């Protein structure tokens, strides 16, 4: 967290990295994240199956919210189905049926799975004929059981003539790649072969980190360069590069990690009496 000394040093009345996304203009977008957001939007609108994978704090939820905000802003006739089961490992086909019924109608879910299945198909068909699209969005999808993952294809196959009734968006962490590996889960190959996989990359360069911080400080009416210099951003990028035992260099510069390091650097600058967070301040941490 930012210390009081840092707040005073940089003339801040609130943490630039806490509660920092309240509207679409607060979202930092790269070419990659714009593409991913548009892909989610088009999947929800026109159909398909996609899995969005990214490390914790990489911005998956923010991108999902950005796509949903666009749907609302453009008044698209798209119904969002979001199962609320906390433990996604316990999410079953029956629970997904319940979510579809409750999010797409005013009916109560039927008791038996057979009755629920018929109810789901009827509700989605009638809604589709009324001009609506439907998208099933599941967060923390890396926790889904393989049997549930396998049966998602059955939901995706629901159709009215040539019209697909349900598109599917899964959002999870990189470990989900193992579940989407046909060699490890042969029984789920039907969905694995049909699902598009998108992965979020870190902000590897100092320039990207600078652009990200520009958005955070601009929201508070502050000039980023007076708080974190360009060479400070480059030093942050270097700090957030790691190396495997095999010598492969990779970056962990995801938004959540950048936020934490920027706070530490600002606290350090305040302690050292530095004018701003520059490379020397970053390298002293």
Task: Set out the residue ranges of the language-model regions.
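A short, basic N-terminal segment
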Residues: 1-47
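Conserved P-loop NTPase "ATPase switch" module shared by AAA+ and STAND
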Residues: 126-148, 152
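Central P-loop NTPase core of STAND/AAA+ ATPases
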Residues: 102-128
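The catalytic "switch" region of P-loop NTPases
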Residues: 80, 132-134, 154-235
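Conserved NTP-binding/hydrolysis module of P-loop NTPases
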Residues: 12-20, 83, 87-110
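Conserved catalytic segments around the Walker B and adjacent sensor/switch elements
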Residues: 73-87
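C-terminal alpha-helical "lid" subdomain
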Residues: 1-21, 63, 109, 189, ...
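Walker A/P-loop nucleotide-binding motif
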Residues: 45-66
């Amino acid at each position: 967290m930012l210390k009081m000394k840092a707040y005073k040093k940089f003339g801040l009345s609130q943490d630039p990295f806490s509660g920092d996304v309240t509207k679409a203009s607060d979202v930092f977008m790269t070419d990659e994240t714009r593409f991913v957001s548009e892909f989610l939007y088009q999947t929800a609108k026109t159909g398909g199956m996609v899995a969005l994978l990214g490390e914790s704090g990489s911005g998956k939820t923010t991108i999902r919210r950005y796509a949903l905000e666009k749907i609302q802003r453009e008044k698209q006739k798209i119904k969002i189905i979001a199962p609320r089961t906390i433990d996604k490992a316990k999410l079953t086909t029956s629970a997904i049926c319940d979510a579809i019924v409750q999010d797409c109608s005013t009916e109560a879910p039927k008791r038996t799975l057979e009755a629920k299945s018929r109810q789901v198909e009827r509700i989605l068909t009638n809604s589709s004929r009324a001009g609506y699209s439907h998208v099933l969005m599941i967060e923390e999808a890396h926790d889904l059981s393989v049997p549930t993952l396998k049966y998602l294809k059955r939901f995706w196959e629901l159709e009215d003539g040539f019209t697909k009734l349900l598109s599917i968006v899964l959002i999870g962490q990189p470990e989900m790649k193992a579940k989407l590996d046909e060699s490890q889960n042969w029984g789920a190959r039907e969905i694995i072969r049909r699902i598009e996989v998108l992965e979020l990359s870190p902000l590897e360069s100092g320039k990207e980190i600078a652009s990200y911080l520009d958005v955070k400080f601009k929201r508070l009416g502050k000039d980023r360069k007076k708080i974190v210099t360009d060479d400070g951003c480059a030093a942050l990028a270097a700090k957030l590069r790691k190396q495997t035992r095999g010598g492969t260099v990779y970056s962990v510069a995801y938004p959540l990690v950048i936020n934490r390091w920027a706070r530490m650097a600002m606290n350090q600058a305040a302690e050292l009496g530095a004018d701003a967070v520059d490379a020397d301040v970053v390298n002293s941490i």
